[in-house]
């Protein structure tokens, strides 16, 4: 018998379904081949994966009067710039003798969406990003730095114009 699973890259939904079906049929496995690009090396460690969506809520308005609104896309871009700065710091924090390639914690932006038209101040924006830590401390470091940046710089700046502005991070 051969069995194959699906959805490895996102939620691994196929593996639990396969396990349930094998149990129901009382089929015991004797071999497992994992289709990862390892060149047949045994892998005994894996980077972590933290996935985030950060939501920015500002104040819409007409594009001809930007001072009367809070542009969520502009604040999201400042947030992304901070993440990119942190990415550079992470490269310098690589542990000695790291077995990973690259040998340091990685951070990347997977998507950004916001606004409804060129002439409308965007009151909403969301940023999807991920962190692949080599060590737990890097995850703690990035979250502390970005949360502090939001709390002490971005949000107060937004709330000067519109007190109901908010920035919310989903994990």
Where are each of the predicted segments found?
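Acidic/histidine-rich catalytic neighborhood of metal-dependent amide-processing enzymes
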Residues: 1-51
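Metal-dependent amide/peptide-bond hydrolase catalytic core
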Residues: 53-171
